[in-house]
Design a protein with these regions (language model features):
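Local sequence-structure signature of Cys/Sec-based thiol-disulfide redox active-site neighborhoods
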Residues: 1-22
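Short helix-capping segments at alpha-helix termini
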Residues: 24-28
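Thiol-based oxidoreductase modules, predominantly thioredoxin-like and allied folds used
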Residues: 29-40
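N-terminal beta-loop-helix "entrance" segment that forms/cooperates
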Residues: 40-47
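Structural micro-motif
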Residues: 47-53
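Non-catalytic, surface beta->alpha helical segment in thiol-disulfide oxidoreductase systems
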Residues: 55-81
Length: 81
């Protein structure tokens, strides 16, 4: 499970989700996009760092998705399940 913490109207967030969508079929994972707008707790945690990407609930990266780095991280998470 990949979670993207996002904001409405965030072009970096849209780019990150598009990159993940392009990898989803090949790597077989689900994507959950959570908008932090209006959620004080999430806004405090992630604020201006969006998009923030988590893999299986653990922080992976923010601002952008590097496909090779994401692949490597996803594989590590799968080995440790």
């Amino acid at each position: 499970m990949v979670t993207v913490y996002s904001r409405h109207g965030c072009h970096l967030c849209e780019n990150a989700v598009n990159t993940l969508e392009s990898l989803r079929e090949e790597l077989e994972f689900t994507i959950d996009v959570i908008y932090i707008d209006g959620n004080p707790e999430l806004e405090k945690l992630y604020g201006n760092e969006v998009p923030v990407i988590h893999i299986n609930g653990e922080h992976h990266d923010f601002y952008k998705v590097d496909p090779e780095r994401f692949r490597t991280s996803l594989e590590k998470h799968r080995r440790h399940q």
